[in-house]
Amino acid sequence: MKKENILTSKATGMSVAELFQSQAIKNPRALAIINLNGDKYTYKVFLLRVLKLATVLIKKGIKHKDRIAILSENRLEYLELEMACAKIGAVVAAINWRLSDKEVNYCISLVKPKLTFLSEKFKTKAKLSTIKKISFIFYDSKYENLIKNAIPYAGASLGSGEDILVILFTSGTTGYPKGAKISHRAFIARAMYSAYEYKINKEDTFPAWAPMFHMASTDLAIGSLIIGSSVAFVDGFQPKVLKNLIQKYKLSWLVLMPGMLEGFIKFLNGKKFNIKGIKTMGAMADLIPMKQITEITTLLDTPYLNSFGSTETGMPPASGGIISKKVKNFSLSKIQSSFCEVILVNNNKVAELGTSGECAVRGPTLFSGYWKAESTNLKDFRNGWFHMGDMMKRNINGTLDFVDRKKYLIKSGGENIYPAEIERILLSHKNVSEAIVVKIKSKKWGESPIAIISIGNFLEKDVIIKKLKKLCRSSLAGYKQPVDILVINETDIPRSTTGKVQRHFVEDMLKTYFNLESFN
């Protein structure tokens, strides 16, 4: 590479650490972190801890592009590690502690970390000592002594734009998790997107309750420090703690996932509390009954985010839509975001208006491929676009409608059936809080759709099912009719960390829960 190209590359390849440090220099007394116990840290104090940890890592032999794994609940130290790695150009492998021991071991073995950070809560997880050539640092009093006695790192930031900062693990329907590589460039672009699209500024606080091994927290936790706002750590979804934060701080984005909204509404109903202000809340509106969105936007006097994104893309490509507060009827069509280009692909051609195609994306918020997965990367990034595996339709007004996952089709008698279409019909009934449609073997058709729902009143089960079958007959083509509608407790529905239903586990439940393997 020519010298001029090296110099221009350095000048334009800014790192997350440099932007965070810039905020600390400009606003040293500004609030950066509110920890689990309520302790507060200014940008100046938090930067000092980050620089001291950077020194600790270097003394442990960590170099540019080395991986460090972390297995911990949400806490200050999690973001501290991400920022220290951003400073020295190392990579954080954020391990999903909800995975099985076997899967956790797989993820750690895949990235081959030189060092692993463990909280007390996960010391015994996955028998990590069986993995060779791995050192540990535990979050205990010894860790605090390491930070206290270290000299702050005074060197230049070693990370740059296209360097990988965090590996987030995504779970598919089959096989082991894949490690999505998120660069400094992607995190910076995602922060700028949040500031632009949702008007997040330095006065806001992000309540990081979703696991930090997921983009729902890590993206905006890092983004908040880039923007100059603050992060409040919460160990999981705790309605009482979130209610207190709502009363004390102006919130940037209150993450709310499918499956938890009904309980949160019940908790808030009848309680008196002041709201400092929330810029936006929620996610994945099309997976939630409309009446719940109306209820929560009324309770919190806040609009709801009609999002469509992924670990690989960040909140773009289509999270530009906001559902106004307190409205009862609204569109769930997605609005394309400003920070990426989206095309819908069908048979290697751009799909015609109104026809479904796979969502393919380009833009600065994109990840840099999956760790050690060349064949998958070549396939998913074909023709210079990242193919998401989601089927969508573009409307005449430019909006996008989610159809379903490309990989989950029900093939019935030669016809393709997308579960989401049937689920939307079922969710339109006022008594249905959850609806999942999966495939079941059929002697006649090969596969048929079958529905599993959650309802508020089990005593009315038979009446509700009868009404739903009538609704399906009037709204869906004959071959799309669910062969049966089964009822289950909402708490028994298997979900991913984002709250999305895991259909392959629901299919297993047909056998274990309902003793069904096929339908005539």
Predicted regions and their residues:
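Conserved pre-ATP/AMP-binding loop-to-beta segment of ANL
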Residues: 28-29, 151-169, 176, 199-205
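AMP-binding/adenylate-forming catalytic core of the ANL superfamily
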Residues: 99, 116-118, 363, 368-369, ...
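AMP-binding/adenylate-forming catalytic domain of the ANL superfamily
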Residues: 477-498, 517-520
